[in-house]
Amino acid sequence: MAEKPQKSDAALREEETLKFWQENDIFKKSVEKDAPKGEYVFYDGPPFATGLPHYGHIVASVIKDAVPRFWTMRGYSVPRVWGWDCHGLPIENIVEKELGFKHKKDIIQYGIDKFNETCRARVLTYAEEWEKIIPRIGRWADMENDYK
């Protein structure tokens, strides 16, 4: 029987770091620390959650994470609330295709409220994967108090 491959040193360090951050509320402490210069607002924008997170999402996310970290280190409070109000049109196009809709009247017959709820549910299909990957790339975002 083949031996199970052991985790690399990098993978073990990642797990240790994430565990330390979580057990010691490091992100929470960074957000709650004194902010003598007041609040700095950073509008991150939601992910394109039309599928699983991929390299392009991760690169953009890492770059965007640098801005609130910089301003936090400069003495500002920078809230980092994650959100799921995901770019309506791409999600709507996916849902229309899944439901076989060709025209606006199809949406009206289906019901606008019901269509909107179906779109919202479609966005949240991948929420769990996003909630796993964002901390793993070292990004600090408040996903527990997210907005939908």
PLM region descriptions:
Residues 1-148:
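N-terminal, positively charged nucleic-acid-binding surface of large information/translation enzymes
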